C-alpha cells in the first residue's frame, strides 16, 4: 500500500543550474531487539515517530515514513502523516530507503538524492537536513552524513556513540564504537585536550545511483565486527562526506534513552541546540 509520499526539495549545484530532486524517507520498524515498538513509544505524550515526522514535514516539502508494520502505518495516518508499507526482511534502514526509491521509480518518478532520517531521531533539525542536501552541490559527493564534537569522556567512551575520523577533504576515514584516534603517550584523561573527537550523527543522504549500489552489497567483516553498516560502504570504495553540525541529536535505542529524551524535551525551550 502506497500513500502519497513524494518529497521534493531543490538545491542548485555550484556549477550546474539544474535543481536536484530529493526524496526523504523515515524508516521505522516495530520489531526492535532492544526496544520493541519503539516508534510508537510516547515522548511528551506523542509517538516518537510523530516527533520525527513533524520535524521533517515542518519544511515546505513532503515526506514519507517507510515501515513494515501496520500499527506504525495506522499511527502515522492517524496523526496526518504519509507512509508506505515495505518488506519486513530488510537488514537496515538504508535497504528500506532503497525499496521506496524503486517503488517510486516504477511509477515514473525521478530523484537525484535520497535522505534517510531514522524514525528514532525526534530531535532532528531542519538545519541538519539542509546541510546534508546542500553538500551535493559538490558533484563528487556520493554519500553525506554528519558529525558533532564530543565534549566529555563519557561520550567518548560509550560504544553507543559512534566515533568518526575524517580527512582534510571531509571524507570519512573510519567509524568505530571505540575512541578513535588513539593518543599514544598520553593518559586517557588528557586525550580530549590533545585531540578533537567527533561522534557520528546517523542521518545520511545518498545520490540515487549510489543508494542502489549500496543495497546490493554483501555484509563485510568490519561491518559485522562493529555492527556499523557504513563500514561496508567504505570497504567497497564508496566515499562518505562528513559535515559538522552544532546541533545535538538524541537517538532512542532503549527505554533508558527514551527517559533521557524526555528530560531533553523538558529542557529544550532553554537550549537552542535541540
Regions found by a protein language model. Give the residues of each.
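Conserved core of the sugar-phosphate nucleotidyltransferase
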Residues: 125-217
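Conserved alpha/beta core of the MobA/IspD/sugar-nucleotide pyrophosphorylase nucleotidyltransferase superfamily
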Residues: 192-274
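Short phosphate-binding loop-to-helix
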Residues: 71-117, 121-131
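N-terminal glycine-rich phosphate-binding loop and ensuing alpha1 helix
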Residues: 20-67
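Short, basic, low-complexity termini and linkers enriched in Ser/Thr/Gly/Pro
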Residues: 1-19, 274
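Short, high-confidence coil segments that cap the C-terminus of an alpha-helix
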Residues: 60, 109-111, 139-141, 238
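A conserved hydrophobic position in a structured secondary element of the catalytic/binding core
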Residues: 67-68, 124, 206, 253
